[in-house]
Amino acid sequence: MRKSEVDVLIIGAGPSGSVAAAYLHQQGCKVKVVEKNSFPRFVIGESLLPRCMEHFEEVGLLKALNDFGFEEKHGARFMKEGVVCHFDFSKKHTDGWNWTWQVPRADFDKVLTDTLQEKGVDISFQQEVIAVEFDEDGCSRTQIKGVDGVIQEISAKFVIDSSGFGRVLPRLLGLEKPSSLAVHSSMFTHVVDKNRPQGNEGTLITFDVVRDDSWIWVIPFSNGITSLGFVGPTEYLESLEGSVEARWQQLLGHSDYYYDRF
């Protein structure tokens, strides 16, 4: 088994893992990032908050992201039964950024990892964490399995779990606990937004609360694609019948505001 040593092992190459890697690399740490998937890859989580921007700037990732031309996000809109609430990020009580981005994550995450690699950060894709052990002094030994089946061991002083929904360390260390929240699921897609209005209406991220326990998200991107999703009780989504298109028509039927557009 091939073995190596680093200061910090980071699990997951998404935004949190990338920012952590960039910062630690700046501080002179020997960093290794392992990512289960290959990039680019589709994933949701496509709307940022302005608080993120200073972190991208601090670790030297902001310019590459800004140069890509992602859709700017200056606020958000929430709707329910004709009542509309706008949040304007410029109306704030503290210093800091008043805008951010709406991003297709396949592009966004690829820009982050490409920039990291240009800076000299070691990133390995299609590498799955299968086991981890911690010594009494807190140092770790983590086994990584590649798509070729080859297993390697990485020793690290620290491990950062940036795997998000993958929950790598909680699963491997038996730390998972059931959620007390109601069980929800989502159905989502990317669509060519042929009927997108001009101006702010066409680019404004919106959450249309169509029932007390369900909502539709609309996240326009700068490339003419819009992320469209429905979140609701799992039981309700599983009760829908017909083709994917037919189920989408049923879900969009809850929104008087967006049905005709999509």
Language model features with spans:
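Beta1/beta-strand and adjacent pyrophosphate-binding region of the FAD-binding site
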Residues: 2-14
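Glycine-rich FAD pyrophosphate-binding loop
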Residues: 25-44
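Short beta-strand to alpha-helix junction loop
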Residues: 93-114, 238-243
